[in-house]
């Protein structure tokens, strides 16, 4: 047993040292990738806290706040139109208990006059525009705006239509594939491999496991975006479980596992942008950026823009005029 320890302990120690060394210096093993478009402000569902979600009015409002990224979910109508809609069933959004794929585009109902904001329970969004929009309409109006498109189910027709629309509008590099399931992402990637992709849920767990095993520096990462919920919003604005104690437990565990500056910094050094979602309060903005996140996804683009502008003003050096005034006062 003792001779075995003489071999195991030095080997383990060397492995730990190498892992830490390359975790901090991944450029020695991997070619650095510069982000095509930096993201600070991402608008969730087009900015669903200030206008009705996924409407053109919401998108225009977000763009007025200089949003860097628009996030949408895609569904397919009966007549083959890709529409921007979070839900497949329309009952929550419109009161009509029908699926999007059972209606033609022209038959889609109006949104309700107010919709509860999922990540701000008890708060409701309103707007004068209640029309559902097609992805093509958004591409036409904002041809050079980066967008993240989530496909929720393995629908080959939907995936290929999204891929072809992206090609037709020559926006492969600024349109992100997103999916919860790896099986769906595999098909998205096959339909248009030129589009960058975000981590799926399984891939996110896998990356975390590799990080804690010390293997992450030695593994390739094809994804360019890591969209992750901020653990501090669990049991406050985000309730993944019905039981309160489960939410509290998950908040504690995920806070310990995910909120690691060294992990975020390593991913960024590998060319992966890290964004936390879906944050709607200034205190959460502060936590996310203090961890080193590239950006934040929010329902309230105006609130996040005010926060970012305020932070920029505080970090800017004093202007010459201000310095001269101070010297005169002295």
UniProtKB/Swiss-Prot annotation:
It is an enzyme of class 3 (hydrolase). The chain crosses the membrane at residues 2-22, 201-221. Pfam families: GDPD. Highly expressed in stomach and kidney. In stomach detected in the glandular epithelium. Predominantly expressed in the stomach (at protein level). A divalent metal cation binds at residues 71, 73, 86. Residues 1, 222-330 are cytoplasmic. Keywords: Cytoplasm, Endoplasmic reticulum, Hydrolase, Lipid metabolism, Membrane, Metal-binding, Transmembrane, Transmembrane helix. GO terms for biological process: N-acylethanolamine metabolic process; phosphatidylcholine catabolic process; phospholipid metabolic process. Its EC number is 3.1.4.-. This is Lysophospholipase D GDPD3. It comes from Mus musculus. The lineage of its organism: Eukaryota, Metazoa, Chordata, Craniata, Vertebrata.
């Amino acid at each position: 047993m003792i001779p075995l320890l003489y071999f195991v302990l030095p080997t383990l120690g060397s492995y730990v040292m190498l892992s830490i060394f390359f975790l901090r210096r991944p450029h020695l093993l991997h070619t650095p990738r510069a982000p095509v478009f930096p993201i600070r402000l991402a608008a969730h569902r087009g900015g669903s806290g200030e206008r009705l979600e996924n409407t053109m009015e919401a998108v225009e409002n977000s763009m007025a706040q200089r949003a860097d990224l628009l996030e949408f979910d895609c569904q397919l109508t009966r007549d083959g139109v890709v529409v921007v809609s979070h839900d497949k069933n329309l009952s929550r959004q419109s009161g009509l208990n029908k699926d999007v794929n059972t209606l033609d585009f022209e038959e889609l109902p109006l949104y309700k006059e107010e919709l509860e904001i999922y990540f701000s329970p008890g708060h409701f969004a309103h707007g004068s525009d209640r029309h559902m929009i097609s992805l093509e309409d958004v591409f036409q109006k904002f041809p050079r705006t980066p967008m993240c498109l989530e496909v929720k189910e393995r629908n080959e027709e939907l995936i290929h239509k999204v891929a072809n629309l992206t090609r037709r509008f020559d926006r492969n590099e600024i349109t992100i594939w997103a999916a919860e399931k790896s099986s769906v992402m595999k098909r998205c990637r096959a339909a248009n491999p030129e589009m960058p992709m975000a981590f799926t849920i399984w891939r996110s767990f896998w990356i975390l496991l590799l990080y804690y095993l010390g293997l992450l520096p030695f593994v390739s990462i094809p994804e360019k975006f890591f969209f992750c919920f901020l653990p501090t919003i669990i049991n406050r604005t985000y309730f993944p479980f019905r039981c309160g104690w489960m939410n509290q437990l998950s908040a504690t565990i995920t806070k310990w596992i995910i909120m690691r500056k060294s992990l975020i910094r390593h991913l960024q050094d590998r060319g992966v942008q890290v964004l936390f979602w879906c944050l709607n309060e200034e205190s959460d903005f502060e936590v996310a950026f203090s961890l080193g996140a590239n950006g934040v996804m929010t329902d309230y683009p105006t609130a996040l823009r005010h926060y970012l502008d305020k932070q920029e003003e505080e970090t800017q050096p004093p202007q010459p005029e201000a310095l001269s005034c101070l010297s005169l006062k002295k």
